[in-house]
């Protein structure tokens, strides 16, 4: 694959670079964190979480809080894709950003950092609201349609509808471990970015870096285990036998469904 223009290369990685302020003497200080915690995995019973729900429930105060908070999640709101990207960006190191860029170089358009992050967003935020097959069908459509805006809008509508339905039924939200969410993200990334291709050693290395950046609380050992397991299943053909890949015929049918959904959305607007 040919090298991308420098300007485009910077544009791809800029969204994931951490915000850095030069020190007084002009040199950059390395960012340090006391503990690695998943940014979408708060304790719902913590004082901060309870206070957040109370603030979100107040009409005027909640509105102001939502305006001032660019990371979302105020009062239990669903974190949208843009807010999710900002949260990831603030936790990413330069090496994490490079992993996204290198993965894009290897996989081409389907490996676009935004596509990869959409897969992670659907698994991290949509787990418990979206079915696994809904996520995989959506990212398979994205691979051939390249219409990320439509998929984002479609999925956020589905998540909101599922959340409203759960609220009406007064059903508690399922507690899904972050490791399970990371596994779902890996499944989605494979369907979107690989299709049915083999996962090479360099791909495994980059996938580990990406998942560790997005799901830091899962732990490097667990991430390494799930990536190695998936690569082994792909190499042995196990995923095809289990029906966990999307054939070209299904992809074409999904593309037709996508056009139908777009037309319906235009007519209803």
Curated annotation (Swiss-Prot):
User: Per the record, what phenotype accompanies loss of this gene's function?
Assistant: Pale green phenotype.
Q: What keywords were assigned to this record? A: Chloroplast, Membrane, Plastid, Thylakoid, Transit peptide
Compartments, as annotated in UniProt: Plastid, Chloroplast thylakoid membrane
**Organelle targeting sequence:** 1-37
Decide whether keyword Membrane is in the record. Answer: yes
Q: What is this protein called?
A: Photosystem I assembly factor PSA3, chloroplastic
User: Which topology term describes how it sits in the membrane?
Assistant: Peripheral membrane protein
Give the gene symbol: PSA3
Q: What does this protein do?
A: Nuclear genome-encoded factor required for the accumulation of photosystem I (PSI). Functions as a PSI biogenesis factor. Cooperates with PYG7 to promote the stable assembly of PSI in the thylakoid membrane. May target primarily the PsaC subunit. Does not seem to be required for the expression of chloroplast genes encoding PSI subunits.
Q: Which domain of life is it from?
A: Eukaryota
Provide GO CC annotations from the record. Answer: chloroplast thylakoid membrane; stromal side of plastid thylakoid membrane
From what organism does this protein derive? Zea mays (Maize)
- A single BP term in Gene Ontology: photosystem I assembly
């Amino acid at each position: 694959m040919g090298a991308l223009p420098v300007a485009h290369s910077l544009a791809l990685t800029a969204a994931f670079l951490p915000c850095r302020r030069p020190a007084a003497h002009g040199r950059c200080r390395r960012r340090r964190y006391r503990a690695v915690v998943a940014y979408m995995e708060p304790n719902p019973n913590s004082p901060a979480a309870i206070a957040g729900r109370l603030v979100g429930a107040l009409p005027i105060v909640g509105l102001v809080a939502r305006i001032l908070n660019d990371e979302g999640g105020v009062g239990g709101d669903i974190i949208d894709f843009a807010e999710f990207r900002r949260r990831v960006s603030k936790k990413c190191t330069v090496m994490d950003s490079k992993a996204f860029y290198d993965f894009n170089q290897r996989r081409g358009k389907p490996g676009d950092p935004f596509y990869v992050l959409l897969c992670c967003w659907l698994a991290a935020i949509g787990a418990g609201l979206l079915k696994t097959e809904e996520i995989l069908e959506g990212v398979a459509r994205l691979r051939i349609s390249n219409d990320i805006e439509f998929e984002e809008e479609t999925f956020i509508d589905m998540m909101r509808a599922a959340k409203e339905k759960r609220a009406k039924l007064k059903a508690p939200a399922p507690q899904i471990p972050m490791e399970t969410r990371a596994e779902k993200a890996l499944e989605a990334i494979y369907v979107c970015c690989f299709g049915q291709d083999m996962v090479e050693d360099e791909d495994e290395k980059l996938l580990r870096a990406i998942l560790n950046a997005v799901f830091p609380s899962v732990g490097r050992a667990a991430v390494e285990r799930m990536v190695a397991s998936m690569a082994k299943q792909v190499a042995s053909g196990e995923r095809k036998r289990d029906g966990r890949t999307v054939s070209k015929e299904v992809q074409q049918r999904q593309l037709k469904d996508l056009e139908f959904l777009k037309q319906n959305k235009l007519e209803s607007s």
